């Protein structure tokens, strides 16, 4: 039996035990994890420093370095996220619906854990803890495969999680990590459908494509965020600029940050010079369409010509595409062609245009007069998210606790037989 098969078998056995746990027991384990993350923070941060040093030496981009970094403040926030998961309602055992049938059978549909979750991710050390906490809360075991960039950080955090599980009398195999950087192990993992019930990739487009094409396990894809905001002709300029600032500048490396701004042609001459000045203050480079270029050049920001391929890629940096569109339908057409079904927004004072945009844009999250940065499990009140799904089955948008469960039908009878 291979190393991966041994992990899969241990995870499956652990999942049976987890499925039987009370909410109180699961919360106890999560509380111990949060406490140990703080008490063992020095070891985790030192491990992260090793990963950061190696990443810098390899020439990793600033956007990815930001994703890789664990600061004391970020680690403290992650520990608090685990405590927030403790406070969330446990979906396991919840009766979704039920009825008494004419046959006398009392039928109900009840939420249950999925079983074993596999998660493949890249330079995102927070994923280790976020995913583990959500899986434990929902009674699922998890096998993690982080990128080589996060090797030392993942080792340190999984060690803390397994220590907490043992302290609570739970199987450490409930949370396991594949430590070898061998890429062949990813291919093997994708075919372990006899042990793993759902696979979640969190990384670039290449990883998602690999999982879709080679996995024999049901895959939840998403997280690629070419997010748009359309500034309608009725938008309030100052309020619109505040939303754009938040969406682009708060955390440019996040998948829900703004990548392309679409501006109605009727306001372009007045709005774009102001936008250019505002973006200059934050060091944003504007990638302008030929129509937008002269208006943006009136402001102070650095402006370069947009390339056709720019509309289809995430910048994950202080760069923003700017395009002028004829009307709301042209904006919708642009989003349909270049969007990734993640998060898109309209800034408008027209109720009719707002409703038209919401109905026409087929993304997992659509906003009216709000920043795309809200697409987040914590912001949605779901707790730490396991991923943002941009597909329509089995989950869509930020995946919280409910998305890590399925359901079973349970029938109660009094020695009933079918007639």
Curated annotation (Swiss-Prot):
PROSITE patterns named in the record: PROA
EC number: 1.2.1.41
One GO location term (cellular component): cytoplasm
Catalyses which reaction(s): L-glutamate 5-semialdehyde + phosphate + NADP(+) = L-glutamyl 5-phosphate + NADPH + H(+)
Subcellular locations according to the entry: Cytoplasm
CDD domains: ALDH_F18-19_ProA-GPR
Any one Gene Ontology molecular-function term assigned to this protein's record: glutamate-5-semialdehyde dehydrogenase activity
Class of the enzyme per the UniProt entry, highest EC level: oxidoreductase
InterPro entries noted in UniProt: Ald_DH/histidinol_DH (IPR016161), Ald_DH_C (IPR016163), Ald_DH_N (IPR016162), Aldehyde_DH_dom (IPR015590), G-glutamylP_reductase_CS (IPR020593), Glu-5-SA_DH (IPR012134), GPR_dom (IPR000965)
Biological pathway: Amino-acid biosynthesis; L-proline biosynthesis; L-glutamate 5-semialdehyde from L-glutamate: step 2/2
GO biological process: L-proline biosynthetic process
Principal localisation: cytoplasm
Record key words, sorted: Amino-acid biosynthesis, Cytoplasm, NADP, Oxidoreductase, Proline biosynthesis
Role played: Catalyzes the NADPH-dependent reduction of L-glutamate 5-phosphate into L-glutamate 5-semialdehyde and phosphate. The product spontaneously undergoes cyclization to form 1-pyrroline-5-carboxylate.
Family, similarity comment: Belongs to the gamma-glutamyl phosphate reductase family.
UniProt xrefs under PANTHER family: DELTA-1-PYRROLINE-5-CARBOXYLATE SYNTHASE, GLUTAMATE SEMIALDEHYDE DEHYDROGENASE
NCBIfam families: PRK00197.1 (NF001221), proA (TIGR00407)
Protein name, entry field: Gamma-glutamyl phosphate reductase
Species per Swiss-Prot/TrEMBL record: Yersinia enterocolitica serotype O:8 / biotype 1B (strain NCTC 13174 / 8081)
Recorded name of the encoding gene: proA
